[in-house]
Amino acid sequence: MSLFTALNSTPHDALLEAEEHSRELQVEESFRVFQSALFHLKAKRFDDAEAKFEQLFNIEVLKPDHWGLYRYSSPTLDLLRYLAYRNRGVFYYQYVREHAEELDKDDIVDYILKVVENLLQALQHSDGDAAVTGLLLQVFRGFKSKRLQRWILEYELTKQPEEMLLLGRGRALLPDTRGLVEEYRRVLRDVRSEPVTEFAARVLTLVKTDSLEVQPLPPVLDKIEQLKDEDDAMMKQLAEYEVNLEELSWECIAESFRSLVPKYKYTNFFSKAPDPYSEAGDPIECIKFVHNDKPIEQEVMEQLSVQNEREPFAATQAATEAPTLEKEGSENGGRTESKRDSELPSDSQRPAQRSSKRFKERSTETNEAELLRPHQDFAALFYSCTGILEVRLEIELSHLNPEAIPSTYPAYMPMLDFYECLNSWTSKHTEFLNQSETKGTSKNKGKGEDSFQLTSLLRSSMFTEENRPTISLTELPYKEVAEFISTVNSNRLHFHAVRLLLLQVLLTVRPDGSCLITDTFWSPILYDTIESFVLSLESNIYDLVYSQSEKYKGLGLSFCEVLMNSLGGIYTEIHAKKISGGKYGELEAQKNKLEKKIDRWVLLLDQLVFEGKLKFRYLWSKFCYLQCISDVTDDRIIHSLDYITHELRNSSMDIDISYANYEHTPRLNMETVQSQLSKIKMMRKFTMVNQMDVDRNDSSNEDQIEALSRVLVGTSLLDTPEDRSMSEFVNQAPFLLKIKLWRIVLHHYLAVKDQSNFQICYFKVLHVLYERLCSKEYSDQSQLQRQQTLLSTLSLMRSFTSLFIELLSGANEWVINDTSQASEYFKLLIDVFILLYPLTYFETLSQKSATTVSFFKKAAKSSVILKDMFVDISCLLVLYFTGACTQKEVVNGVEVATEFIHALHLLIGGFTFCDAANGNFLNLAEHFFCSVEGSSSFIPLKQILLCKYRLSLGGDANSFEDHGAKPQVLEMHNAVRLAKYLIRFEYQNKNPYLISTNRSNLKQVIENVIDVIGKIPYAENHILARNVYYFEQYLEAPVTAKIIQEALQGCISIELTKPRDNLQEIVDLGLYYISGVQLLNLYKVRKKTLQARPSELDSIIETLKADILYKTNRFETWFLLGKCYSYVVEDDLIWTSDRLVVASKKATTASIQRKAILCYLMALNLCQLSVDDPSLSEAQKMENAFIKREIYEVLALELLNAYFKPMEGLPFQRDIAPALVLTETGELVEPKNSPQPSISSANIYRATLLVFTNADEMYKDSQDALQNWLNPHYIANLRFKHEREDFITDGFDIIIRACNLAMKASTSNDNIIEPHYSLVIKCYKSVKHGWLRPEDALKHLLNDNSFLAQEANFYSHNPENSVQDFYRKIITLLRRLLALDKRKWHHRPTYRIARILFDDFNDVDGAIQEMGVLMALKSVNKNLVNIWKPEYERPGKHFVYTYQYVMFYLKLLSHKNDYISLGHAARKMRRFGSGMVNGSLATDKAVEMFINGARAALGINEKEHAELLLPTLNYQAFNRYSDELIASFNKENYSYEVLESLAISYQLKKGSSGIAFDGVCLSIYFKYLYLPWVEEHEAAEATQSMVKFVEINKNVNPTENETASPQPAAEPQKSTTKQVSSRKRVSKKDAFDKISQIVDKIT
């Protein structure tokens, strides 16, 4: 094949050519498929035709891209596409004509639309023929689309422009063209309302009128035309929205009507699209109200007929039988708070499951006594407490049914009303309860806020007396509601029309002159809905009023009033935001937009003439608007009020407009106007004073507050004219204005924390409010008025009480400074408490009665308000009860108060709201109980802690109740106070260290307290930082003889200072000390079960360190700190020997051990100082003596561990400070200074012995029945090591005493072996050194025969017998000790037996056999020495013993020349290096012994058999012979010694990076394996004949041969040396590779 490529040809061109060719083939294939489709279509085989069309349009050239475009275009392709789409459209048309009877109308329409789609697609590729345009024209006629008909006609007429010349000659046109022109004329006539184009005008002027008969449509298209007519008729029908009404009321209509449109945030009403209807998905063309799935008219008529037939009934009965439940939430999403808080019923308000009457009665009888028990228990204690203070109650709390309240009781009527409110609570009651609520809290008020409150009174809606309620809208007859519904349903009104009609009914003036929005009381949902309608339609209604002012001026005035009320709400919220420091920029924007709207309305309404009530409504609304936007100093306000007053006086009408629904618009009557006028004048006076004396603004405000306080309290000190003027103003002011003034005064005293004046004012206003409820004026009101008065008064009581609680609980003090009037105040609080008591009793009644719904479940939000008030009043009741007890000096007043608080807690906790009012009651109870000394408050406190913190102090869980309180976070001041109480209660002056029981209850609390306190910032307190420095300086000091002496004398001192911060008291009380005791006890328990971790000690050390740094001078803390360090050292030394092998790690451990010794010395020092403390009781002195003895013991033991192995006195070493030395040459050098001992060995010995002796002697002065055997045991050991021969005088008596004490301390399962072993060994050593005769030693051993249990003759010794008989008896006793070891942990007797056998009997085999028990030479265990640490073995001594045993065992094996066992030992010791001290020395010794033994036993010479042999070997021959040797290797052909030596040496070489084992391993391989194999096969290998073992003995120099020149490959070799020198050398690695394979077969 030729590789020629033309210069003008590229691969891309080839690809294009191939693609073009492929496209041509596709076109051919398309035409073939198209012809086949036409063939099937002509034969009316529609399924086959459809398949072919589907195949046709799947061909690539007919498929457009995602955008509907085609990649390639050509005349052929355009024609193909036109024909394909055209004929597929025809196919669909023919199919639907043939199957029109079988298809439903939807399928017919779908197919016709496919026809249109394909035909229109065909027109995009080529000009359509007459058949296409004719078919499209018929289809468009069927769809009755004139525009499409006109388009297709114009398309057909303009398709050939040359035919335009023939338009003037009618006879020259073909009939088809004439038909098109006539059709075009007809279409233009039908669409004559549209402008005619220039072309159409020319056609109409040129063509002669020639009426042609209209051809009828085919049946299929005629059916389409019919369907089109049906659709048009259907579209003309209005879409009816059915609105379901739950009841027939304006509220329900408004609520359901508002739900038709999307919910709107309040801010959206000020946007460009304020109407939420604009956001609706579908238009609401027609609204129809329905109720219970039947027309509303029928329902209305039925209810009206029933209403006319029966008598009117009381509102209470209606409320009881069908209460309207509160609904939570607000539609006003743009504001921070809803203007009218409402509530939703909880899930528990669902109808209860029906049960039989018999079951209900039986359940009620059974549970009634149990239900009333909480009230009976509380009442009994309550009466007992009030009786102590000689307060007589006129009512029985245990049975407080409404019918049981005495009619003579002062609060009889308000209590009945309270019960009625609870029973029939509705959203109306919620409105009453929230009427007096104010936004913001006192905590957010700054200085000077009181004066601002004075001026802000003008913007309050609570001006008038009582704000007397008017008739409720729901109480009006149903007639108007029915008429409205009938009008809407009969006229089929649009959404806008219904909304406008509703606004007209509710906002316009009625024929009798009344207006529903101003003269009736609405529910919050109704007013909120109307307000949203007003904000949505404000612009449209403005245009309506502007155009038809006389007709709609009442509606416009109502709109303006609603807008002004909304503006007042925004002003109020802005004020609240300013007080709380919140952001109010959005509210400012809303205010500005709303003011612009109102200004436009005011200008419009100013042009209208109002008469009658409308006139006064307009004047009053302008005044309210002016009041919002102006300051109190604005004269327009006074002028406006004067004008209104003048008009009211001159009016013949009695003007009294309630404005019940306007929260920020006051009632309009003469009394209101005059009150407002006088109030403004007074406020102007205050404001003018502020403006004239700006420099004394604060003082003048305070003077005004003080004057106002004197006036309100009613003091007679009204000397100045200003005071008298203010008094007149206050006396004439309405009640709620006085309440506002009271609030200002109380806020002021709260801000300055003046408890005395606040107390006077609080109880004065509380008395006024209570007397208001008990007055005749209250009883004379209607029930609805009484309920409003009651709930608003309770709300005021709650508000003032919460302020008082805030003042009393400041800094968590809960203290009443002035208790001189506590008894009188307590009586008033009792009256208020009884007034509120139905809140809890009603819940009990609701549980008794199946028809009564729980108030707490029915009205969740409102119940929270009343719960808070009940709890706050309970707190004051407790405080003033304790104050009254103090005032009257009641005996056991604290105990009675404790019971009273606990009873109150059980009462309110039983109803699950003891944590109400931000947990005030729980805070007070906790504060009081923690301040009580004694155990009376412990049980109540446990219940408080369970509720407040979910903190359980143990005990029987069933004895405490779960009140469902939300847990609070434990704060520091509470935590500290709680810890103080519990520490005093739990320990009661006992030392926590000596209490054996684990106070787990206190442990949890202590941990929580410490967690709350957190890590103490020592660096932030200069005293603590100083203490840290001196503390660390002491712990870094060396242990000297002086410091030990000073500790024993109590003369050590550290310059610590008490920081005296907020933690000093609790630390002095023992918080951190107790925590350290508990944590250390827990660590000990975990340590016994091997679960403790050393890291746990870090937190304990930090805890104890905190106690020391606060200078508590508690010697127990130093003692425990020393124990922590001892545990750290013990953990370092017990588990691995790394801390003993690595010098740096051992130095760290020694430093910690030195700290432990210093801590013990300081503990001993402080303990010595406390001995002479006269303030200590005898019990405390005994406790201190007990701890002092333990300090002696641990100090002595720590000194012992530090001095002897494995630490070997390292903690007593100190580094010499670096110094520069001048040498002889004049250079300054820093000499290497080795650490020097800080105390001599003799002093360590004397100190240790002295401390042990002191500890042992202290047992004589104590009453302990069991002494510590370790003290005499260690005393004896120390003396024996130091005194040696002198020890025998009295030393054995000490050992015998230790043995006797150990026997008493032993148990049947665990015998203490150590002192008995010590006795046996000391007797043995004394005899061996000649210090003691065998018979004398046996006498000492006889003293311990109760444990050794030998025959009497065993201890007899004939002087003629040899000493070895005595040694045999020693071995017998040692075996006896091993037998008594139940746990099999002791190993020293076994070692000593082996030692005696070897040293005294020269029995190497016996010694090896004994040591074999301790050694695991050939086991799979990696440890060579298999021993356990006995309980009383000193830390780290285990690794010393291991090293001792290993070295002795190696010595035994060396004496026996057992080099194989030495090799196994060396191999294991490489893996067991961390199990002993000096592991590397022991390993090197074992290796040395093995190598020497192998050399001697196997007669190998490493130089001869390895170093000199390797260079002489032929590489290829070595590999071949070695492979043959490995392949035919058989262990039976070699001795055990050779194979084991080879395996051991290779394994040692593999585990070592050195070359110590190379020679031995290679020598064994070549001498005993390789060379004998070569000698056996050298006869067959001539090339290797000159490599003889004997030639090596001739001192052949391989260097010379290696330097010889290589011979040519074809030249015969002339000498062996030349042959060797020319090949590759055999390396050690090559040899070891072969050896490894041999070793694998051996092992």
UniProtKB/Swiss-Prot annotation:
GO terms for cellular component: HIR complex; nucleus. It comes from the Eukaryota. This is Histone transcription regulator 3 homolog. PANTHER family: CALCINEURIN-BINDING PROTEIN CABIN 1-RELATED, CALCINEURIN-BINDING PROTEIN CABIN-1. Its main location: nucleus. GO terms for biological process: chromosome segregation; G1/S transition of mitotic cell cycle; negative regulation of chromatin organization; negative regulation of transcription by RNA polymerase II; nucleosome assembly; transcription elongation by RNA polymerase II. Residues 345-354 have a biased composition (Polar residues). Residues 311-370, 1598-1629 are annotated as: Disordered.
